[in-house]
């Protein structure tokens, strides 16, 4: 009996091993065609849910919140009120709060050595004017007048260059006119205000040559007798008052004419209207 039981157990185990082997072979064969194994669906545990009935107060709050979220139509009054509130907030922020601090430079921050060097450099390089000592008590220029001083120096420099240029140009012109002796007799400043043809006559009209001049061309005199034809005839120009009076008279005459025209036009209109009224009255009657 015992042997038969053992044999039966061995047969069962061998059958099981054969089934497992067959299953492994099937899986190996199926792996050739399927790369992924489909996992078996697992059941999820259901969580018990509790249904709560909302109260009336919560419903009212939800409805109010929904209504607040809805866009309301903007009015001018609401826009102005919002703008005023923003302005008030800004004004409140900008309020001045007095601070308990000392005015001026805080102690210990100034470099004394650096300030002394700057003062020395200014004294050495700055312009010195002795006549300023009576006004400001020091010879150096104050900060406010340094710019005006520099502008005056530049202006004088450019004026000097202009003068040198004029002298050079004058020398060239006189050398071309063979009048270099005039430069030795007169200075450049006196010659600057003269014209090149000062020796000739001032009048644009040519003077008639007389017999005395023809006979004695070298005779020179300070006064000469000249005919009336050499002078320009004097003309009297109208004054400003006369011109203004003439303008006023013209304006008054023009205004009178315009008034007379207006009066005649008004009379014609009235007569025409009167005739029309008479015609209408006769037709009605």
Curated annotation (Swiss-Prot):
Alphabetical GO biological process terms: regulation of DNA-templated transcription
Protein name per Swiss-Prot or TrEMBL: TATA box-binding protein-associated factor RNA polymerase I subunit D
Principal place of residence: nucleus
Self-association state and partner proteins as the record states: Component of the transcription factor SL1/TIF-IB complex, composed of TBP and at least TAF1A, TAF1B, TAF1C and TAF1D. Interacts with UBTF.
InterPro entries to which the protein is assigned, alphabetical: TAF1D
Bias-annotated ranges (Basic and acidic residues): 242-264, 273-285
Superkingdom per UniProt: Eukaryota
Alphabetized UniProt keyword annotations: DNA-binding, Nucleus, Phosphoprotein, Transcription, Transcription regulation
Record keyword Ligase present: no
Biased composition (Polar residues): 21-39
Bias (Basic residues): 85-104
PTM sites of type Phosphoserine: 24, 134, 229
Pfam family membership, one: TAF1D
Cellular compartment(s): Nucleus
